[in-house]
């Protein structure tokens, strides 16, 4: 398992083809219509439209903006607006603050608001919930858990020897946890007046916390932690024999309604929402691309 993860994390820029990422099929996500095909990226000026989304997807979004704008990741980062959670991102689209949004699936209430405005979503990629086990440097922390093992670590007064720390309330990773496990994290251990649902994960021996795979690629893995395999699979593993990492989640693209087809926002939306755009994005977010961003390697708190 360590060898598989190492292979994913050490693929160089000249080997961006090593390993594959699942490319989801285009869907309407509860609304009619889908992004028209524009298989070849057409250069757009990032000053001519507003693009953003939730903070957890900033790696994917900034890479896409850099590609379409024919500019550097850093320049795209300065232009795009990736902050907050997905509900806030979808609201910014409704309010007209953003022309194009990249975010995780909205709540049922938000989905209804989007549909009422004629906004449909196009599935453009997959992310995953990743669990990190804290340990001492000298310990061997190669772990392979089941989903039930993870839930046990988050139960009050469990005897597993592990204490689960959840992400902040309202964060996308907290919502994804509830989606993939069917309920919110129930941990209630107190630490300096905070419970483990809100306290920053200390990444010490016996602690478990989580983030998203794309956030982990962007920020780096905290020291003295190991990624927990789930059902024998790591998030970077290539699916084989019908087996894949089980804790995955889709993310979506949407554009403000009423724009002309030659509007820069529409050109960008049609490219990224096309088969070619989704295929490119799946390859672009592989670890070598994350290394080229130059973002901080410190992730002191799950997001």
Residue ranges: model-predicted function:
Residues 19-99, 103-115, 119-303:
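Exported/periplasmic ABC-transporter solute-binding proteins
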Residues 1-9:
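Positively charged n-region of N-terminal signal peptides that target proteins for export
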Residues 14-17:
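C-terminal motif of bacterial Sec signal peptides marking the signal peptidase cleavage site
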């Amino acid at each position: 398992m360590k060898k598989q993860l190492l292979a994913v994390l050490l693929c160089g820029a000249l080997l961006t083809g090593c390993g594959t990422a699942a490319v989801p099929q285009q869907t309407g996500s509860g609304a009619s219509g889908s992004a028209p095909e524009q298989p070849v990226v057409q250069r757009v000026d990032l000053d001519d439209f507003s693009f953003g989304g939730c903070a957890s997807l900033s790696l994917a979004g900034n890479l896409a903006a850099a590609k379409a704008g024919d500019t550097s990741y850093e320049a795209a980062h300065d232009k795009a607006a990736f902050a907050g959670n997905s509900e806030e991102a979808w609201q910014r689209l409704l309010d007209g603050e953003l022309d194009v949004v990249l975010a995780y699936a909205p709540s049922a209430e938000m989905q209804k608001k989007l549909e009422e405005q004629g906004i449909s979503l196009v599935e453009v990629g997959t992310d995953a919930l990743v669990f990190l086990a804290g340990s001492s440097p000298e310990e061997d922390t190669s772990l392979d858990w089941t989903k039930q093992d993870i839930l046990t670590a988050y139960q009050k007064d469990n005897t597993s020897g592990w204490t689960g720390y959840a992400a902040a309330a309202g964060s996308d990773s907290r919502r994804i946890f509830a989606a993939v496990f069917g309920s919110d994290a129930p941990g209630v251990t107190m630490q300096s007046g905070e419970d483990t649902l809100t306290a920053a994960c200390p990444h010490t021996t016996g602690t478990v916390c989580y983030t998203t795979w794309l956030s982990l690629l962007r920020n780096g893995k905290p020291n003295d932690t190991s990624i927990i395999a789930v059902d024998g699979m790591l998030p970077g593993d290539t699916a084989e024999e019908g087996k894949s990492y089980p804790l995955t989640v889709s993310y979506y693209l949407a554009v403000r309604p009423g724009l002309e087809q030659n509007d820069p926002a529409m050109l960008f939306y049609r490219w990224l929402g096309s088969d070619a755009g989704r295929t490119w994005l799946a390859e672009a977010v592989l670890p070598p691309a994350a290394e080229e961003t130059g973002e901080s390697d410190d992730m002191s708190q799950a997001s």
